[in-house]
Amino acid sequence: MVLMIVSGRSGSGKSVALRALEDMGFYCVDNLPVVLLPELANTLADRDISAAVSIDVRNMPESPEVFEEALTKLPASFSPQLLFLDAERNTLIRRYSDTRRLHPLSSKNLSLESAIDQESDLLEPLRSRADLIIDTSEMSVHELAEMLRTRLLGKRERELTMVFESFGFKHGIPIDADYVFDVRFLPNPHWDPKLRPMTGLDRPVAAFLDRHTEVHNFIYQTRSYLELWLPMLETNNRSYLTVAIGCTGGKHRSVYVAEQLADYFRSRGKNVQSRHRTLEKRK
């Protein structure tokens, strides 16, 4: 397992790096004091999960020896790696001017330029020990995240997770949906007394919907639409694509259609999840 320690000058992109590492499956902690690194690693050791911790100038140890001592106390199962982010002085000044945020050392009555210079001196022990130094001066947020994925995972694109979720319009549209499809026009099993207590996961309901050509046409055209744009979505620096399928109550039609779409894209080797909001509420 890896313990990725992320440091660097303020404004160089530590928060962006931490979010990218979280997307890669790292357990992330922001601004953890150095002396607590062994405690965090021991807590995660049994969970078999890599971790990433950001350290900024505010929680730097008083001496490099404190940092080295903390690393020696890590469990043997963890391999520490130090990532240091930096940027040109003028770039950092511009970024602070654009965001209008205060530098962490500004409370010491220093000008922005002086705070940046002092921070550089304070962080030098970490910079000199870094396994990887990235200059973000000419990088966008997305380019930094992409570089980290390339360096750490050996591939450029993160794997997109497709989420197909069913819902009932009477309960409201999911706020996390990227696409919303309305299937209330499809034949409704609700009007069959035998099917009413069932859900779209049950075979009799699936057989009822499977008999209707319009159901097949909708599923085919929806999956074709998603397939058309999926390559661009996969390169758009996103982790999830959430497709919401809604019917009146979220019990029959939307559940069946969401499952059919999920099965199709799963069979194509995509990373797929399915969930059913109305059914989850009934548990």
Curated annotation (Swiss-Prot):
Its taxonomic path starts at: Bacteria, Pseudomonadati, Pseudomonadota, Gammaproteobacteria, Enterobacterales
Q: Which organism is it from?
A: Photorhabdus laumondii subsp. laumondii (strain DSM 15139 / CIP 105565 / TT01)
Which keywords label this protein? ATP-binding, GTP-binding, Nucleotide-binding, RNA-binding
Its annotated function is as follows:
Modulates the synthesis of GlmS, by affecting the processing and stability of the regulatory small RNA GlmZ. When glucosamine-6-phosphate (GlcN6P) concentrations are high in the cell, RapZ binds GlmZ and targets it to cleavage by RNase E. Consequently, GlmZ is inactivated and unable to activate GlmS synthesis. Under low GlcN6P concentrations, RapZ is sequestered and inactivated by an other regulatory small RNA, GlmY, preventing GlmZ degradation and leading to synthesis of GlmS.
In alphabetical order, the GO MF annotations are: ATP binding; GTP binding; RNA binding
Which residues are GTP-binding? 56-59
Protein name as annotated: RNase adapter protein RapZ
**Record-listed ATP binding positions:** 8-15
Q: How does it assemble?
A: Homotrimer.
Of which family is this protein a member?
Answer: Belongs to the RapZ-like family. RapZ subfamily.
The cross-references to Pfam families, in alphabetical order and at most eight, read: PapZ_C (PF22740), RapZ-like_N (PF03668)
Segment RNA-binding: which positions?
Answer: 266-283
